[in-house]
Amino acid sequence: QKWATERKVEDKKEGYDFPIIRYAEVLLNYAEAVYERDDKISNTDLNISLNLVRLRVNPAMTPLTNELITQNAGMDMRTEIRRERTIELFNEGFRLDDLKRWKTAETEMPMDIVGIQWKGTEYEKVWANCPYETNAEGCIIIEKGRKWEEKNYLFPLPSDQLQLNPNLQQNPGWE
């Protein structure tokens, strides 16, 4: 459950002076950190982290295990850990930072953002004149033509800081 205060903001004194982190994020961070450190993760570590997040949503869901990954060609543990994080933290503002940390933004960011599958569904009949472009799978394209440059992995250093310290060098691509 997402958490928020019950206090009203009418007095303009609402705010928090401490970080807020969901327990699910802690568990996902743990699973990712263990895997990235060791290039593997035990089923025990999966059961005390990522699988708790999965099973909270659907107790009947098959737990993620090393055996499941081995039995299914095309699956790999790193991708599954990242996929679970993407799903659980959807729309919470983590995605861009995750893509930067994983250094996958150059492949993910230029991809089209797609919405619902429209063609071949009941919506195609109800909304006969869909004003949006669709892709080959019949999904509405929300945004396309996005670009990503290597320099976007780092922010530019503020010019006043560069002037204060001549030993600082501007981040690559921001010169």
Task: Describe the predicted segments one by one.
Residues Q1-E175:
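Acidic/polar-rich alpha-helix caps and helix-coil junctions
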